[in-house]
Amino acid sequence: MSTLVKLSRTVLAALLFTLLLGPGTPAGAESFDVTNLVTDDQSVNAAPITDPNLTNAWGVSHSSGSPFWVSSNGGGVAVTYSVNPTTNVTSFGPVVVTIPGAGTVTGQTFNSAGSSAFNGDAFLFVSEDGTISGWRGALGTTAETLQVASNANVYKGTTLVMTGGHAYLLAANFRAGSIDVRKGDATAPDLAATFIDPNLPSGYAPFNVQVLGGKVYVTYALQDTLKHDDAPGAGHGFVSAFDAQGNFLGRVATQGTLNSPWGLAIAPASFGTDLAGDLLVGNFGDGTINVFSPDPASPKFLGQLQGGNGSPLDIDGLWALVPGNDGNGGNSSSIFFSAGPGGEMHGLFGVIAPVPEPATGLLLLSGITTGWLTLRRRRRSVT
């Protein structure tokens, strides 16, 4: 066999190796960037915007085109931010809303039922003092009380579910260990079941609840002795799925990498190379983001989002995970987050996006160049 044929095969092998590497990489090897957009203190977390109202940023929601609404648990308000879907340039939204009661607002949700439910309030909020409140434009800068505070209730998260033509607010009651249901109108019937995981170990309670992809997902965290806060730790957590009537569908995630899980989102179609439709579960306990199959009939752990250093991505005090809306609420291909870093003493709002991969053309050029240089060296050695 001639030397030239051998060298041609070397070039071909280099090209084939390049093609096998690109254009994508396995999800576990793909890296993601975190970009801070709003902070309460530049000396703690740098960001383009400083908002002193943002302390322990918690629940996040938006309508189909609205700015982001963010719960400030330590500030007693809900703040709003507009995010350009192309550039992520962020600006203050139109309103800051005072939350009634103690103001310890946690979860929130957009009222997609409109004027037919909850007095027509556009956004609904729950708080750690047991208050449930709502806001609509006519209320100005203060939300109204829909349910007064109670020591029996410590609400950590909330969502809206529509079933049978009626709206229901679901609230994760961490103290009582239940999903509390509030009807949107007086004619709404009771739900068929009560969102109970029959196999949940003692000491765990609902930490958050979200409607995603037609299912109701509930995260569970270990209660502290006062049943007010979570007791973080490796393996401290579960995620279960229910239908809209509260019937248990199955367990999605059991302990493992879970650590006081709270944030929940379905990965957008272009969020990473092969994560589309997977369930993202953010740990408040250690700030990492887990990936699971969303189907309770075939539960599967798929890994964790990776940072640029090859280690799991982690965000101190991570709370919400929410895709954008391609309007005033950022790009729908990105995941936006809230956090209470520094032991919930500070606030942070930002965006998570996959690191762009090298273009296929560049990879091919690299392979061709490698092969050509090899060919030149071999030819020189032959002559």
Regions found by a protein language model. Give the residues of each.
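Residue-identity detector for glycine
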Residues: 22-24, 28, 361
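Sequence/structural signature of beta-propeller domains
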Residues: 28-354
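A short, hydrophobic C-terminal helix/tail in secreted or cell-surface proteins
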Residues: 357-374
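C-terminal membrane-anchoring or membrane-association module
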Residues: 372-383
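Bacterial N-terminal signal peptides that target proteins for export
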Residues: 2-12, 375
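Bacterial N-terminal signal peptides
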Residues: 11-23
